[in-house]
C-alpha cells in the first residue's frame, strides 16, 4: 500500500463510521454566544466554564503584559524564555494549591506527556483509569513502562492491579473530573489504595481547577487529597490556555532536568502569564465564588429538566453534561437539529469515547443565563 492509499483508507473508514472529525471556523466561540457564517448560536460547547475568556481585567492584563514583555517569550525557559512573570505565576499557583513548586507548560497535553515520559522507566508500571484523557493514555502507551488500565473509578480493580508484583515504581493516573463523562474520581479512596502499595498518584484536574472547591482549588482540595503530581490546565476554568504541574521541590528539579517537552519548547508568552495571574486573582475572589455558585445553579436547572429525555444522563454535577445517545449518526443528527434551533452543541463519537457511547457533550458556563438553559431544554424536548 502506498502512502496515499493508506491515508485514503483511513479517511474512508472514518466516513463510513460517521466518525470523521471536522473543524468549523467561528468568528466568536468562547463565550455565551458562538458566531459562525454570520449566524449566532447559544454556545454549549465551550470549556470556558467560569466565563473568564472575555473578562476585562484579564484582557487588560494580557495587553499590559504585551506592552511590557512583547508578544513572545523568545525561547525555552532553559535559555531566555523564563521571565519574572512566569516565576511569579508559578509561585502564586504553588501557594494557592498548597505545593512547594509549580512548573508551567504550554498545554495540558504537553504537561501530561512530559511528566510520564520523564518519570517512568521499563521496570516501572503505570496504572491508569480506563477513561483517562488521551494525553495520559498516549503518554503511557509510548512509555517504556507497562500500562495497566483499571475499570472506570473501580478502586477494587485498581487495588488488584497494584498488588501484582512490580520490580520498579508504580504510578496511578486518573482525572479529577473526567472530560467526556463529567463525573468525578473517588480520589480519597484511590490515594489510600495507592499509598498502601507504595505508589505515587498523578491527577489531571483540567476540568476541576478553578471550577470547584474552596477558592476554586479543584477536585483534590475538595476531597482533601494531595497527589504527588497534580496537573492543572488554564484553558477551562481560567479561560486562557497553558498548564502547570504541581509537585515537590525535588520533583520540580528533576522535571527541569528530564522533561523534554519543557526543555525543548518555547515558553508561553510572558503576557499570557500576566493574564493567568489576573485570572487566578478573579478565581480566588468573591467574584469567583459568585461565578461558581451561578454555574452550580445552572447545572441544577439543566439536570432537573432532562430527566425524562430518552438519553442516558451521565452521573455528573460538573459543567460537563453529556447526553449519551449511542449511535454515531443519531448523535450527529441531534447536534445538527440543535444548531438549526440556535444551540451550538458538539457530537462526540468514537474513538474519543468508547464504541456505542456517542453523545452530545453539553457544557454549561457561568456566562450562560437561566433563559439560555430553558431554551436548550425546550429544543431538547422538541419544542423549539
Swiss-Prot record:
Gene3D superfamilies: Aspartate Aminotransferase, domain 1, Type I PLP-dependent aspartate aminotransferase-like (Major domain). The keyword Transferase applies. Pyridoxal 5'-phosphate binds at residues 108-109, 179, 207, 233. Its cofactor is pyridoxal 5'-phosphate. SUPFAM superfamilies: PLP-dependent transferases. Belongs to the class-II pyridoxal-phosphate-dependent aminotransferase family. BioF subfamily. InterPro entries: Aminotrans_II_pyridoxalP_BS, Aminotransferase_I/II_large, AON_synthase_class-II, AONS_Archaea/Proteobacteria, AONS_Proteobacteria, PyrdxlP-dep_Trfase, PyrdxlP-dep_Trfase_major, PyrdxlP-dep_Trfase_small. The gene is bioF. It comes from the Bacteria. Its EC number is 2.3.1.47. Substrate binds at residues 21, 133, 352. Keywords: Biotin biosynthesis, Pyridoxal phosphate, Transferase. The modification N6-(pyridoxal phosphate)lysine is found at residue 236. Catalyzes the decarboxylative condensation of pimeloyl-[acyl-carrier protein] and L-alanine to produce 8-amino-7-oxononanoate (AON), [acyl-carrier protein], and carbon dioxide. It catalyses: 6-carboxyhexanoyl-[ACP] + L-alanine + H(+) = (8S)-8-amino-7-oxononanoate + holo-[ACP] + CO2. This is 8-amino-7-oxononanoate synthase. Homodimer.
